[in-house]
């Protein structure tokens, strides 16, 4: 993940003011359902896991960027984050009560994003939950929000931007999740209806 080698050092500092309300919403959801085993897929710098640990919830994370994981190792709150491909997790089936990912699916090509969703589903316990934070653009999304999101994604680089546009064109999260047995539990919007926090429950096929 070479594209993150330079950005990892300032990633949290740059984005934290915008993402912080979302991080705290995720914390509120975790508190509400009292999850015991938590996995953060594509955990980046571990910011969400550190916030959860600060409030008494232990979890672990995986990411494919050594630079991001190097940042995750720093700070007062120590969390367990591992270098691993989210499309081929080593975890056994149905291991976690909650599997979450934030702002990861839109930046992957479609096949990779689908595989990550499949793997998240595999390692989630029956009756457990999957929480996804990502872009969801619709007629309810403000023009300002759409412009800001497209600009941010353009800044992230050609491949990232290409995958983002494909994600939006194909239908975003609804399309990625359409073939899964997941049932929506809760949803919350941020960024003038441009970002969704989506909680889903794994039910038997």
Where are these regions (language model features)?
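Conserved class I S-adenosyl-L-methionine
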Residues: 1-33, 47
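Nucleotide donor/acceptor-binding cores
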Residues: 35-37
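A short glycine-rich, Lys/Arg-flanked "PGG" loop and its adjoining helix->strand segment in the class I
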Residues: 114-126
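Core SAM-dependent methyltransferase catalytic element
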Residues: 180-182, 186-205
């Amino acid at each position: 993940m070479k594209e993150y080698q330079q950005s990892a050092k300032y990633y949290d500092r740059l984005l934290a003011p915008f993402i912080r309300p979302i991080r705290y919403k995720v914390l509120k959801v975790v508190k509400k359902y009292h999850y015991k085993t938590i996995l953060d897929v594509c955990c980046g710098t571990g910011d969400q896991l550190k916030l959860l640990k600060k409030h008494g919830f232990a979890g672990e994370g995986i990411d494919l960027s050594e630079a991001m994981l190097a940042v995750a190792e720093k700070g007062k709150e120590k969390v367990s984050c591992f270098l691993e491909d989210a499309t081929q997790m080593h975890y056994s089936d149905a291991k976690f009560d909650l599997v979450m990912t934030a702002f990861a699916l839109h930046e992957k090509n479609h096949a990779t994003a689908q595989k990550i969703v499949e793997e998240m589903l595999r390692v989630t316990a029956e009756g457990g939950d999957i929480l996804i934070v990502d872009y969801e653009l619709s007629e309810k999304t403000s023009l300002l929000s759409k412009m800001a999101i497209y600009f941010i994604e353009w800044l992230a680089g050609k491949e990232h931007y290409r995958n983002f546009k494909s994600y939006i064109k194909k239908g975003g999260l609804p399309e990625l999740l359409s073939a899964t047995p997941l049932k929506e539990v809760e949803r919350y919007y941020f960024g003038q209806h441009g970002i969704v926090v989506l909680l889903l429950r794994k039910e038997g096929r």
